[in-house]
Amino acid sequence: MGKTLDVAVLVGSLRKDSINRKMANALAELAPEELKLSIVEIGQLPIYNQNADENPPAGWKAFRERIRAADAVLFVTPEHNRSVPAALKNAIDVGSRPYGQSAWNGKPGAVVSASPGGVGGFGANHHLRQSLVFLNVPAMAQPEAYCGGADKFFDANGKLINDGTRQFLKDFMQAYNTWVIANIKS
């Protein structure tokens, strides 16, 4: 595949020192050269309201265009109440509407969940996967990425310091590269 593939990365946490933003940055650094990962900011997206579909806010339009332009999507999220944070759910909803015009349709995807807790965002990871099935986002099934104890993976500057995690994420990104190439819309 000769061209570099554009991967839109959505980080579920809006927190300034987010573990998941650090994780997304690490994934970008470890990605094979065929993939260019860029974080799509979701914190300022207006809350989805179907009443605005006929005259959508500029933020919705720009977000939808950015997702449509991407070759693939990667979600990096913490877990809030066994689900994804509200900002990520809102972004998913904004990108999926109006009905029949989803920006997500057919884009190969993957989910990485990270948290300080031991289960590594398992609930959020699987809840998000349910939405991706409905949105026709073929999500990579293996390897799965539940990164528990993730607060210990990074130094004060946000750099990945855990060698085992580095190798796992490198392998994950290689598998994701293969998945994207196999599932990309032509």
PLM features: residue spans?
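N-terminal beta1-alpha1 ligand-phosphate binding loop
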Residues: 2-34
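A general structural signal for well-ordered alpha-helical segments in protein cores
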Residues: 7, 20, 24, 60, ...
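A generic structural motif
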Residues: 32-38, 138
